[in-house]
C-alpha cells in the first residue's frame, strides 16, 4: 500500500494561515488530520469534514498548564473528533503518555523521522504509534533541498504509508529556511500576537521566492492516494 497521510499541526497559528492551509487542501480534495493547540473557528466549522485530534504541550512554559494533569484537562476540552494526539515539540514521556491513554486516546504520532518509512506499531500503553515521514520544520532544519529530489520521489512512490506534517504558518508564509520563521517568531512579540496576526501582516511576511510551500504542493501531487490517521487506525483494527 502506498498512502500519503496529510496532517496539520496548528501550533497556535493565526486564523488567516489556518484558513489558507485548509482551503488549499480542500480545493485539492485532501482531507487532513488536524492537531489542535487552541480554539480555531476555522477548524471547528470543518469538524464534520475533517479529522481533528489534539496537540498538547507538556512543558513548564506551556499555555496549556504547568503540570501533566493541567495540560491534559485543558487539551481535552478542545473540540475534537479523533482520539489521537501529537505533542508539541514531541515532548512526551511515560507519565504524559499514560495520562493521555487514561483520557481516552488511542492514536499517538510522536516519532518524527527524516524521510524514513516506518510502519505503525503498538507501544507499551496500547497506543497505535504512527511515525512521521516528513515534517516541514524538520525538513527545513535539516537543510534539505526545496526541490523534489530523485531520492525523495522514489521513496514517495515506493511502498508504505507516509505521514507528513504541515504547519499553517510555514505553509502560508512559504518559509525558505528554518531561521526565517524563527526570526518572525522573535519579532512579533509573543504567542498572543502570533496567534492574532492579521491577513495583512501575514501577507507582508510571505516569502515570494521558492519555499517550503512550493515543495509541499509538488509533493502532494506525486502520491495520488491520500488517507487519514483515522482510516489507518480502522485498517489496523480489521
Language model region names:
Residues 1-49, 73, 77-81, 94-106, ...:
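Terminal accessory/targeting
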Residues 2-9, 53-66:
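Glycine-rich phosphate-binding "P-loop"
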Residues 45, 64-70:
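Core nucleotidyl-transferase/polymerase catalytic module
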Amino acid at each position: 500500500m502506498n498512502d500519503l497521510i496529510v496532517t496539520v499541526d496548528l501550533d497556535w497559528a493565526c486564523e488567516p494561515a489556518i484558513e489558507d492551509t485548509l482551503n488549499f487542501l480542500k480545493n485539492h480534495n485532501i482531507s487532513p488530520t488536524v492537531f489542535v493547540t487552541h480554539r480555531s473557528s476555522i477548524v471547528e466549522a470543518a469538524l464534520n469534514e475533517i479529522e481533528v485530534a489534539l496537540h498538547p504541550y507538556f512543558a513548564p512554559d506551556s499555555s496549556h498548564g504547568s503540570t501533566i494533569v493541567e495540560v491534559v484537562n485543558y487539551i481535552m476540552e478542545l473540540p475534537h473528533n479523533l482520539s489521537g494526539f501529537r505533542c508539541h515539540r514531541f515532548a512526551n514521556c511515560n507519565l504524559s503518555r499514560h495520562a493521555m491513554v487514561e483520557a481516552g486516546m488511542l492514536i499517538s504520532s510522536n516519532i518524527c523521522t527524516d524521510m524514513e518509512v516506518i510502519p505503525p506499531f503498538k507501544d507499551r500503553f496500547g497506543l497505535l504509534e504512527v511515525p512521521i515521514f516528513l515534517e516541514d520544520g524538520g525538513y527545513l532544519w535539516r537543510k534539505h533541498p526545496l526541490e523534489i529530489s530523485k531520492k525523495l520521489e522514489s521513496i514517495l512512490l515506493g511502498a508504505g504509508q507516509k505521514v507528513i506534517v504541515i504547519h499553517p504558518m510555514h505553509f502560508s508564509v512559504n518559509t525558505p529556511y528554518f531561521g526565517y520563521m524563527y526570526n518572525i517568531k522573535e519579532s512579533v512579540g509573543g504567542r498572543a500576537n502570533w496567534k492574532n496576526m492579521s491577513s495583512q501582516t501575514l501577507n507582508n511576511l510571505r516569502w515570494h521566492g521558492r519555499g517550503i510551500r512550493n515543495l509541499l504542493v509538488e509533493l502532494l501531487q506525486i502520491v495520488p492516494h491520500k488517507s487519514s490517521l483515522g482510516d489507518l487506525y480502522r485498517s489496523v483494527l480489521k
